[in-house]
């Protein structure tokens, strides 16, 4: 017997939840990956993908087929699915889906700003932007000279606007300031998304809060790793960490003081969920920290589908689909470069 909240969930969102579960069922199987890694050329890869749910998505691509073309078409396809979900969603699912696009918007704005700094063609950079993070004012990013310019002229009408309140300054935009801006935006965004999910309650909070806590902790680890050997002070580094997650607050304080990878690993050793991840780095498989974090992310997103009546399945599906796209692009790159020794270093999903 369905309880009241679950019954209302089905009325408002049941169709889309069923649809996204169907999409998840169409992800590539392990047998598909076995077939893909045996392909000799990108044309072979294209032919095999035609036998999967991807169908003729490369039909309009002219020869020669490239990894970039395959990657672009896969992203477009994912974007089409996501836009269908968004166009047919009701509140508060609509707001949840908008939160999902914000990370892609941040990832699009930053390269555009760096490109403007280096006098690169806006059109060239736009071609590399993620379709899920596109917004009308993107092309005007090159007119901004300070974060305040960026906010007032470009981002004030976008979903990113609320996250800029903590990032406003009159500092000139150089490469370091732009990178700091990226991390501050992500911090504000993740904190707001986490608060939204927590306040929503029910199964959505139970599924999404641990996923976002992991994302916050992952960002803290990666920020720390990337700051070694740079001019970023320990105090400034700590201000970039999202203020929630398993590491918050004591782990973040210790992480801010770390001076190398071993000291960072010592912090992770205090947390049962992170200790095995750091132990898996290197070794015979040559895994990077990024690899083990992706593997953990996949596990969490697959588990999200074990629960019903929640928004987390939409987030989980997009993340799993993105990992599938990375996997196919990796295999395609290995085929293209004739570098087959690493072709099996993709991250399995199912």
Curated annotation (Swiss-Prot):
Coiled-coil positions: none
Recorded superkingdom: Eukaryota
Keywords, comma-separated and alphabetical: Hydrogen ion transport, Ion transport, Transport
Recorded GO MF terms: proton-transporting ATPase activity, rotational mechanism
Thylakoid recorded as keyword: no
Gene Ontology cellular-component annotations: apical plasma membrane; proton-transporting V-type ATPase, V0 domain
Keyword Ion transport: yes
Gene3D superfamilies xrefs: ATP synthase (C/AC39) subunit, domain 3, V-type ATP synthase subunit C domain
Disulfide partners: none
Matches recorded under PANTHER family: VACUOLAR ATP SYNTHASE SUBUNIT AC39
Function of the molecule: Subunit of the V0 complex of vacuolar(H+)-ATPase (V-ATPase), a multisubunit enzyme composed of a peripheral complex (V1) that hydrolyzes ATP and a membrane integral complex (V0) that translocates protons. V-ATPase is responsible for acidifying and maintaining the pH of intracellular compartments and in some cell types, is targeted to the plasma membrane, where it is responsible for acidifying the extracellular environment. May play a role in coupling of proton transport and ATP hydrolysis. Regulator of osteoclast fusion and bone formation.
Similarity section: Belongs to the V-ATPase V0D/AC39 subunit family.
Assembly information from the UniProt record: V-ATPase is a heteromultimeric enzyme made up of two complexes: the ATP-hydrolytic V1 complex and the proton translocation V0 complex. The V1 complex consists of three catalytic AB heterodimers that form a heterohexamer, three peripheral stalks each consisting of EG heterodimers, one central rotor including subunits D and F, and the regulatory subunits C and H. The proton translocation complex V0 consists of the proton transport subunit a, a ring of proteolipid subunits c9c'', rotary subunit d, subunits e and f, and the accessory subunits ATP6AP1/Ac45 and ATP6AP2/PRR.
Protein name (Swiss-Prot/TrEMBL): V-type proton ATPase subunit d 2
Species per Swiss-Prot/TrEMBL record: Pongo abelii (Sumatran orangutan)
Gene it is expressed from: ATP6V0D2
């Amino acid at each position: 017997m369905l309880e009241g909240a679950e019954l209302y969930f089905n009325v408002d969102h049941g169709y889309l939840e069923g649809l996204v579960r169907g999409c998840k069922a169409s992800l590539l199987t392990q047998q598909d990956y076995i077939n893909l890694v045996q392909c000799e050329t990108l044309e072979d890869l294209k032919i095999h993908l035609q036998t999967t749910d991807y169908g003729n998505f490369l039909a309009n691509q002219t020869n020669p087929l490239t990894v970039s073309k395959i990657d672009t078409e896969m992203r477009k396809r994912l974007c089409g699915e996501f836009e269908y979900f968004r166009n047919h969603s009701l509140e508060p699912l609509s707001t949840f889906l908008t939160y999902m696009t914000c990370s892609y918007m941040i990832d699009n704005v930053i390269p555009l700003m760096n490109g403007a700094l280096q006098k690169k063609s806006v059109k060239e950079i736009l071609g590399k932007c993620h379709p899920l993070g596109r917004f009308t004012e993107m092309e005007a990013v090159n007119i901004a000279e300070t974060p305040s310019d960026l906010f007032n002229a470009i981002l004030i009408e976008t979903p990113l606007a609320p996250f800029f309140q903590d990032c406003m300054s009159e500092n000139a935009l150089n490469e370091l300031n732009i990178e700091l801006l990226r991390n501050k935006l992500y911090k504000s965004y993740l904190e707001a998304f986490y608060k939204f999910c927590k306040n929503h309650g029910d199964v959505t909070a139970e599924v999404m809060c641990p996923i976002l806590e992991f994302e916050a902790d992952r960002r803290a680890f990666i920020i720390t790793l990337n700051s070694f050997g740079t001019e970023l002070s320990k105090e400034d580094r700590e201000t970039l960490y999202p203020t929630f997650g398993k590491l918050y607050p004591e782990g973040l304080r210790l992480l801010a003081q770390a001076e190398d990878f071993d000291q960072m690993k010592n912090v992770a050793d205090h947390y049962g969920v992170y200790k095995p991840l750091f132990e898996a780095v290197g070794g015979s498989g040559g895994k990077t920290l990024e690899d083990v974090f992706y593997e953990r992310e996949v596990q969490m997103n697959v588990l999200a589908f074990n629960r019903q009546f929640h928004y987390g399945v939409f987030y989980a599906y997009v993340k799993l689909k993105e990992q599938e796209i990375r996997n196919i692009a990796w295999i395609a790159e290995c085929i293209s470069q004739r570098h087959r020794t690493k072709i099996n270093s993709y991250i399995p999903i199912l």
